[in-house]
């Protein structure tokens, strides 16, 4: 949809082939910009009846509320001027608008209401569309593209008109603003698939309006290990993961000899990738983990 910290825009195509084709309910516990879902070919999931967007950040859930009303959203966004490809001189009022919107929607006492909901969605897109990819939007600075790039707000608006994206918007059944544990309780079933993409270990404070701290990683592990359905979990590796989701069980036989390796039920897949959001080459490579209970 649009650049967002922790988003799976670059890695979503790798994740999708691991999603079972026979699922009836698709749920993301930390949906963000829903990149994995948008990379799915819906025709490949003939039994899919229910799609659940869930995020604890109310700005995200409000954005998706209006993305489902794509014509209205597009019309509203078209009233917000932004940088143009090939136009090197950026009017100073664009940065002023950005700073005003950023200060307003990220203030501690800000409330989204029925009356301001559409306006807030537009202002949020305006801010997300003019910061460095993956930056924390409430503290990031305005980026002047100097005519070298097309504004990401306009790219987002293109998606609102795109038939493929519209098909995906129309398929979204419920938009939730719940803690991950509550959304699991509400939608778990033998035919449910959960994709979990939590704030990564030691990066919890990078996220806007988050309610996920270091102790919540173990809570998440305990919750998803007990579900009826299937899950995929994205992370970078950290020491506790092998304890919570062991790949192998080791049995020691007589004379302290290694007796066997037994498969535990958790599948680990890994992929190296480049992080688009990094400005330092030495920090621009990561290894993405996908842990599954199938």
Q: Model-found features: residue ranges?
A:
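Short, solvent-exposed loop/turn segments at secondary-structure junctions
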Residues: 33-36, 57-59, 130-133, 180-183, ...
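Long, positively charged, glycine-interspersed low-complexity recognition regions
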Residues: 213-294
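Short active-site oxyanion
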Residues: 22-26, 48-50, 169-173, 225-231
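SAM-dependent nucleic-acid methyltransferase catalytic core
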Residues: 1-14, 69-195, 199-205
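SAM cofactor-binding core of SAM-dependent methyltransferases
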Residues: 22-103
